[in-house]
Swiss-Prot record:
Keyword Repressor included in the entry's annotation: yes
Species for this entry: Streptococcus pneumoniae (strain P1031)
UniProt family annotation: Belongs to the HrcA family.
One GO MF term: DNA binding
Name of the protein in its database record: Heat-inducible transcription repressor HrcA
Amino acid sequence: MVTERQQDILNLIIDIFTKTHEPVGSKALQESINSSSATIRNDMAELEKQGLLEKAHTSSGRMPSVAGFQYYVKHSLDFHRLAENEVYEIVKAFDQEFFKLEDILQEAANLLTDLSGCTVVALDVEPSRQRLTAFDIVVLGQHTALAVFTLDESRTVTSQFLIPRNFLQEDLLKLKSIIQERFLGHTVLDIHYKIRTEIPQIIQRYFTTTDNVIDLFEHIFKEMFNENIVMAGKVNLLNFANLAAYQFFDQPQKVALEIREGLREDQMQNVRIADGQESCLADLAVISSKFLIPYRGVGILAIIGPVNLDYQQLINQINVVNRVLTMKLTDFYRYLSSNHYEVH
C-alpha cells in the first residue's frame, strides 16, 4: 500500500524526471516534501520494493518504472486541467478556412505533434456508426465505373470497379436503384448486415444472371468500412520506439483499431502504458481523448510517445485542442447543414 507521503514523493520524482530525464535523489525532494532526508530515502526504498521506482545504473538516484508511471496515471493525473498559457496559440492555429473534415483533423494532429514532439493520430466517427446519405455510380469507361458514397452528408468515399462481363447498362441502373432504395439513411453496420441477409434474395429477383453480383456488392462497399484516419509526426517514433512499432504505424487501419480498443465506450479519456508484452506498442504510452463531432458522433485524438512523458502537460494540451477543435467542427457542420446562399 502506498501512503500519502509516498504518493507525493512518487509524483514529484515523476515531475522532475520527465523534465530532466535524470535520476532523482532525496536531496532534490526535500524542498517540496516536509520530511527529513532519511525519511524520504526510506519511502523511496519502499516505493522501489513495490516496483514503482527503480535504481539508476550511473547514480544513487531513482527513476520511475513503467509500473510507477501506470500508478501515477491511475491515481494522480488530473484529466480536467487546461493548458491556459497555450490557449491563444491553439485558437490562432485554427483561425483559417477549412474545406474538408480531414484538413481540420490534420491541423489538430499537427498542432499536438508540435506541442508534444510525439506521434499523433486523429480518428473520425467510427465507420460502422456513419450513415449513408447519398449514392451514385459514374461510368468511367467501357469496362470501369466508380461508386460514390456520401456518409453523414459530409464525407465522400469512392470505390472503382470493373463492370462484370455479363452486365448490361440497365443492370448498373438496377444496382444503383437497389442501393438507393434499400441502404440510404442506414448506418454502415446496418448495410453490412443487409448485404448478407436481404440482398441475395433481391438479386435473384432483379438480375437475370446473378454470378458475381454479391461479390460486386462486397467489393464496392468494402471502402466504407475503412477508418478515416490522419496522422502527424510519424517520424518522431524513431526517437523513442522500436522498429516493430514504427512499422506498425504503416498499417493505419490496425493503428485505428488499437487506439479504439484502448478506450472503452464509457470513457472520454484514457492513458494506456503498454509493457514489453504488447508487441505492437511495446514500452509506449498512448493518451487518448474523445472529441465531439457535431451532428455525427465522436472522434478520437491520440498521442503516442515514450513512457517517460510529462502526462499532466499533455493532458492539459489535448484538453485545449479538443475544445477548440469541437468549436471549429461546430462551425464547419453548421455551415454544411445551412442553405449556402443564406450564409453571409
